[in-house]
Amino acid sequence: MSDYKNTLNLPETGFPMRGDLAKREPDMLKRWYEQDLYGIIRAAKKGKKTFILHDGPPYANGNIHIGHSVNKILKDIIVKSKGMAGYDSPYIPGWDCHGLPIELKVEQLIGKPGEKVSAAEFRTACRKYAAEQVEGQKKDFIRLGVLGDWDHPYLTMDFKTEANIIRALSKIIDNGHLHKGAKPVHWCTDCGSSLAEAEVEYYDKTSQSIDVRFNAVDTATVAAKFGVSVVNGPISLVIWTTTPWTLPANRAISLNAEYLYQLVQVEGECLILAADLVESVMKRAGITQWAVLGSCTGSDLELLRFTHPFMGFDVPAILGEHVTLDAGTGAVHTAPGHGPDDFVIGQKYGLEVANPVGPNGCYLAGTYPTLDGLFVFKANDVVVELLREKGALLHVEKLLHSYPCCWRHKTPIIFRATPQWFISMDQKGLRKQSLQEIKDVQWIPDWGQARIETMVANRPDWCISRQRTWGVPMSLFVHKETEQLHPRSIELMEEVAKRVEQDGIQAWWDLDPAEILGADAADYVKVPDTLDVWFDSGSTHSSVVDARPEFGGHSPDMYLEGSDQHRGWFMSSLMIATAMKGKAPYRQVLTHGFTVDGQGRKMSKSIGNTISPQDVMNKLGGDILRLWVASTDYTGEIAVSDEILKRSADSYRRIRNTARFLLANLNGFDPAQHQVKPEEMVVVDRWAVGRAQAAQAEIMEAYENYDFHLVVQRLMQFCSVEMGSFYLDIIKDRQYTAKGDGIARRSCQTALFHIAEALVRWMAPIMSFTADEIWNHLPGERQQYVFTEEWYDGLFGLAGNESMNDTFWAELLKVRGEVNKVLEQARSDKRIGGSLEAAVTLYAEPELAARLNSLQDELRFVLLTSAAKVAAYADAGNDAQQSELIAGLKITFNKADGEKCPRCWHYTQDVGLVAEHAELCGRCVTNVAGDGEERKFA
């Protein structure tokens, strides 16, 4: 028997079956960076319309975690897909480099500033530490396959950026949004500093819940409000609080104007309580007998006076909408120095903003004899005992509730009134303008809009000052006596900014005021405060995007971060941009959820369910991590586990195998010489290119809408179903056995070439390493990198008015599926081995029969059988099987007649008819020795 193997067009490619990504990807990265891939892309895209995704800076502290990977990969997918869509999309990664976490790390290394080291030495150490952290994180981000200007990232501690942050504040001051005031701010006694809202986390804490009597100063007047002339014993208004330590700062009792309050007689005294809460108060106080003497509204009690239980002064009853009936007594203890609601209502009534607590959380001297010097949380018990001694304590119990804590120390924080600098939400209409700007932004998902609107509508003024060492100085001078800003503040801040641009923030602390103030130096002092780090990152639309030439003066199109950034970076950026420029800093804001494990639990070292991106890349490769990110609906929680990553690896293999099949069968194909014109191609080949065209339209739309999981789904459907289970299956015979340079094979290769050109581009934003690898194995002249390309424009399909249009092939796929069911059963019954052992008869109703017959002798190639014929549905015998899906179709089969051709494996009756090729069928003889078979349809 002759060996005809060398007459076959067997698939051949240098593209390996196994990705071996963990090993190969680092070499690819090396090539990308040695050849300056990012620079090549920028040069190729120069002059195109821009799309700017502005990188929200991660904090320069610690290793990257899986959440960082999700964020950076999503950004990279968008930047690369925008490049494919014809945009110039520069990406400059950034880092947030100032602030408390770095200070704490450096304190552990060298001690606190002013103790073992000077403040200047401390700042130098902070800068060095942050730079080291940036380098560590940068390596990991690059390993993810994220392309960007990694050699020139932006750091908030770059001298120029520090200077531009000062300039941003200057513009906000110039626009009239800054004011100074003593306001209650989140205060961490461990940090010794105020905290931004985004630095506050909530944990369960057990507190003492107390009901306290405030005795009426004028019993008769109070009783009269309830329509009562005589009462038995004193009258007291009962307040409820879970922070006994704040009672020394009490300056009023808040009631709700609309609520009904009752005067309740209990043994020897009368209590004032909200009518709806009388029963619950009595129950917890253990009072079983009481009588309601009279009722009135909260507004009736406004400005009546009640005696503080131990401070020796009396306080007014005032009215506030923040008073609810959710818990307590309907009367709220009000300390303007210790709470934002209390502060706001206190401003309305002109109350003193008392702050008897120092930065360390201890009472100041002169507060109260038994409290002076005590730490506030230790003072709770002392205050409760004091109330008990004074006969003011109605009830005390333990309460587990959610309490604000420092994100860094995890310890409870307090509200504390301190002199601070604020960006006002209302004095120049910032709140109103911001709410208007939000409406002009596209929020993805759209619930983000309502979320940030609620936050902006309800947020207090933004306290931007911090009492820290490592941060951008506010660069302000205030009058020693009046504490007013210097009248030339804008000009002076520019002077400071110029120095900072040269020498960094240390220039401010080294500055002798006389150098820029001249004679005014005698009357003015430097403000020692630094800026909230959220001001640093929130001003990058100005300090970085406006300042760097790569962005060409364009403002950012998109911000993309985790959903916690509505109150973080999205908020601070919106406030600063609106205060500076009167408009939002972004056109689109996209948020993603947090990573959780396979069971939906938060990632936690204590549970042991964390997955390190470094481990995944070292084991499975960056493209698997990227495919996992793209496969997930990122708008909700993003689940990751070894099992989920394994599924991504399986999906990757299917896509890779499809790409390998395409490349292997393009062996010997030169697109410049061998392409077949569309009108001369075999119909099924045009259909396959048309399926790629349809897939590309959906994939482009999904990329445009940032629905990357839909990109992956469509890609998988195309590779596994349309190509893998049909087209790539049925073309093997033609591809391998047809004449090597004949039109039947070249038509097929033309289709495979167009499909591969499209597929590699669909993959590039997500599976970047593999796309680059495929690109380097594709035939024909091409640019060095797929990343400089645009979506493939060489696709075409079948016309709708052709008889063998997409509808025809969709029906044929169903028919083939029904035939396969019959043959599968026969195979499991051991009646046939492979499908080529079968000769199939399709009994079809006239219209279907006509469509099937239009394929002529090529129907068998679609069905992968040695023979196939069509007969009338009415002629079907009892042995014919009725199709489940197609009413007018029955199927039967017999063993194929004739002999098996050793070259094509088809059974035919013309094997051996040509003496020179005595073992071959007629078709193979034509392909080996003649002009090659002709195929029209399949």
Curated annotation (Swiss-Prot):
It is an enzyme of class 6 (ligase). Binds 1 zinc ion per subunit. Zn(2+) binds at residues 901, 904, 921, 924. L-isoleucyl-5'-AMP binds at residue 561. Its EC number is 6.1.1.5. One of its GO terms (biological process) is isoleucyl-tRNA aminoacylation. Gene3D superfamilies: 1.10.730.20, HUPs, Valyl/Leucyl/Isoleucyl-tRNA synthetase, editing domain. One of its GO terms (molecular function) is tRNA binding. GO terms for cellular component: cytosol. The keyword Acetylation does not apply. Keywords: Aminoacyl-tRNA synthetase, ATP-binding, Cytoplasm, Ligase, Metal-binding, Nucleotide-binding, Protein biosynthesis, Zinc. Pfam families: Anticodon_1, tRNA-synt_1, zf-FPG_IleRS. PROSITE patterns: AA_TRNA_LIGASE_I (PS00178). Its cofactor is Zn(2+). The keyword Lipid metabolism does not apply. InterPro entries: aa-tRNA-synth_I_CS, aa-tRNA-synth_Ia, Anticodon_Ile_BEm, Ile-tRNA-ligase, Ile-tRNA-ligase_type1, Ile-tRNA_ligase, M/V/L/I-tRNA-synth_anticd-bd, Rossmann-like_a/b/a_fold. Signal peptide: none annotated. A motif ('KMSKS' region) lies at residues 602-606. A motif ('HIGH' region) lies at residues 58-68. ATP binds at residue 605. Its main location: cytoplasm. Catalyzes the attachment of isoleucine to tRNA(Ile). As IleRS can inadvertently accommodate and process structurally similar amino acids such as valine, to avoid such errors it has two additional distinct tRNA(Ile)-dependent editing activities. One activity is designated as 'pretransfer' editing and involves the hydrolysis of activated Val-AMP. The other activity is designated 'posttransfer' editing and involves deacylation of mischarged Val-tRNA(Ile). PANTHER family: ISOLEUCINE--TRNA LIGASE, MITOCHONDRIAL, SOLEUCYL-TRNA SYNTHETASE. IleRS has two distinct active sites: one for aminoacylation and one for editing. The misactivated valine is translocated from the active site to the editing site, which sterically excludes the correctly activated isoleucine. The single editing site contains two valyl binding pockets, one specific for each substrate (Val-AMP or Val-tRNA(Ile)). NCBIfam families: ileS. This is Isoleucine--tRNA ligase. It comes from Yersinia pseudotuberculosis serotype O:1b (strain IP 31758).
